[in-house]
């Protein structure tokens, strides 16, 4: 066994005995560190004292070229940094050569939006069951206002202004937003309110479970997924996909990025731009159509 292996074995014993990590976590550390052992051995290293920041960077590049994803590489480098920190604490190394070496950011995977035709099919649900009426109202509100799931389940009856077709929501950072919800959502909320007392009247929540309590986020996720299957949609339906679809459809129709930002409750415009997968060409076309200085003289 080489010094490279010996030090790793000592570190794993430390994690097991001193840190009392689970067997699964220990196995993950072992796999990550075996990868660097193999790379170090291939490059002629006999001990970890010979490892420098250049070798760690080369190891990261090699891992990426072999198909390791950004998130997995981040975990691998994290394990390596922890190992080298331990070697420093044992006076085996003077400094951590992996410090400052980071993996590229993992790409942000956004949910695909539901197109307008599929959305209409999703909303055209059988309403013979009072719970189906509730679900239809939730779907209409979620898609009609682009709410976050937490905002939907947090709605109370007092947050409604059905006469003006608006709803008050408490977003991230305890920031309130007053949002239009559309006439379809208003109609289905009214329909649900006519049936709501069948499940209870003491709770202030707008949307109740069949037990008469505020509906949970998990229950909403489950019901939306079930309706997606029942209505024959190919893609899994979850609440965030409705919010994403709202943003995409609003932006396609209006081109008003700032307005969509306000509706979504994003603090930064850049978040909205990424969220709605805008590209530069679309932004340029919005600018050319709207900005006075963009209009070319004849």
Curated annotation (Swiss-Prot):
One GO term (biological process): DNA transposition
Q: Name one GO molecular function term.
A: tyrosine-based site-specific recombinase activity
Recorded hits in Gene3D superfamilies, A to Z, give: 1.10.150.130, Intergrase catalytic core
Question: What residue stretches are annotated with the Core-binding (CB) domain?
Answer: 2-88
Q: What keywords would UniProt list here? A: Cell cycle, Cell division, Chromosome partition, Cytoplasm, DNA integration, DNA recombination, DNA-binding
What InterPro entries would the database entry show?
CB, DNA_brk_join_enz, Integrase-like_cat_sf, Integrase_catalytic, Integrase_recombinase_N, Integrase_SAM-like_N, Recomb_XerC, Tyrosine_recombinase_XerC/XerD
Q: Where are the active-site residues found? A: 148, 172, 240, 243, 266, 275 (o-(3'-phospho-dna)-tyrosine intermediate)
State the similarity comment: Belongs to the 'phage' integrase family. XerC subfamily.
* Biological role stated in the UniProt entry: Site-specific tyrosine recombinase, which acts by catalyzing the cutting and rejoining of the recombining DNA molecules. Binds cooperatively to specific DNA consensus sequences that are separated from XerD binding sites by a short central region, forming the heterotetrameric XerC-XerD complex that recombines DNA substrates. The complex is essential to convert dimers of the bacterial chromosome into monomers to permit their segregation at cell division. It also contributes to the segregational stability of plasmids. In the complex XerC specifically exchanges the top DNA strands.
What binding partners and quaternary form does the record give?
Forms a cyclic heterotetrameric complex composed of two molecules of XerC and two molecules of XerD, in which XerC interacts with XerD via its C-terminal region, XerD interacts with XerC via its C-terminal region and so on.
The name under which this protein is listed is Tyrosine recombinase XerC
